[in-house]
Amino acid sequence: ITAVKAVYYSATGNTEAVVTRIAKRIAERLGVSVESYDFTLPENRTQLQNFGPSELVVFGTPVYAGRVPNKMLPAVQTLFKGDGTLAVPVVTFGNRNFDNGLIELRNELEHNGFHTIAGAGVVCSHVFSDQIAPGRPDEEDWKILDDFADRAAEKAGSLTEIPAPIQVRGDDPVGPYYTPLGTDGKPAVFLKAKPLTKDGCLRSVRNLCQGLSHGLHKCRGSITGHRYLH
C-alpha cells in the first residue's frame, strides 16, 4: 500500500470525522500518505474517481432508514472505481441500527472493483437531535475505532492473496428501500418541507449547507423552533 484515501459523504460532519480518523490511523500504521475526497456537495459528484491497486480507500456514508442514502447511491455506484483496490466500508448511524447500510455499501464497493478487508458501523449523534446519542463518538468509541484501524492496517499489510469480501451483518441481497405506510396501510405521501428561518440565516451558510440536516447544525438558534417544519 502506497497511499490511503478517505472518501465520504457527510452532511453534518459526523461521517467525515469518523472516516478521516480511521484513514489517518491506517496511514500512520502503514507509513504512507493520506488524502481526503469529500463528495457531499453536488460539484464534487461530477467526475469519475479512479483508485489503483496500491491504494487503500476508507469509504463512508451515513445510514438513512437503514440504507445508503438513496440520493447518494447513484454516485456511489458510478463515480468511484477501484482496480483491485483495498477498501474499508464505514457507515454511521444515529444510535438505532445500521440495518443493511453496511452490507449494501460493501456490495457496491466490491461491484466497483474494490476488495473490502474490514467494515464498521459507527454510532454518531443523530442529525435531528443532540438528545439522541449525544456526544457520540465518545472517548471510548474513538479507542475502539483506533483499534479497528490498527487491525485493518495489519491485515492490509499482511495480505498475500485477493481477500474474500468482508463478512458484515445484513441481508444479501438487501432488497427494496423501506416504504413508510399511513394509517390506512397505503404508502405515505410526503410534502416537501420548507424551514421558517430568521432573515438571512440559511443564506449565510448556504455554501456549507447540505439540505436541512446541515442547516440544523449550523443555524440552531434560528430554525429549530417548533415551527421550522411547518
Model-derived segments and spans:
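Iron-sulfur cluster-binding cysteine motifs and their immediate structural context
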Residues: T197, R203-H230
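FMN-binding flavodoxin-like domain, especially the glycine-rich phosphate-binding loop
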Residues: T2-A6, S10-T40, Q47-A188
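Proline-rich low-complexity regions
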Residues: P62, P69, P137, P195, ...
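Charge-patterned, long linear interaction tracts outside catalytic cores
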Residues: L181-R203
